[in-house]
Amino acid sequence: MAHKKGAASSNNGRDSESKRLGVKRFGGQQVKAGEILVRQRGTSFHPGENVGRGGDDTLFALKAGAVQFARKRNRRTVNIVENVEAEPAKA
């Protein structure tokens, strides 16, 4: 019977911190300019209309509006559809 734990058990017990990746704002949600839409490693989602891409591939809103997910040329894209405010009707 061993009186020491052995190399394996004492070498285990480490884990990296979670990176909190994923979609942060979903389709139809209203966002302001600068809000983060998707945190990702690589380009699972590509930037579309009114969406910018950061150095770590984070997608963020360039303008205020509603989030819209779409497919373009077999790529998943994220767009921001600007809010078009209707003018009051003139009588």
Swiss-Prot record:
Keyword annotations of the record: Ribonucleoprotein, Ribosomal protein
Region (Disordered): 1-25
Classification via Gene3D superfamilies: 2.40.50.100
Biological process, per Gene Ontology: translation
A single Gene Ontology CC term: cytosolic large ribosomal subunit
Disulfide topology: none
InterPro entries to which the protein is assigned, alphabetical: Ribosomal_bL27, Ribosomal_bL27_CS
Pfam families: Ribosomal_L27
GO molecular function terms noted in the UniProt entry: structural constituent of ribosome
UniProt record similarity statement: Belongs to the bacterial ribosomal protein bL27 family.
Family matches, as PANTHER family: LARGE RIBOSOMAL SUBUNIT PROTEIN BL27M, RIBOSOMAL PROTEIN L27
Record protein name field: Large ribosomal subunit protein bL27
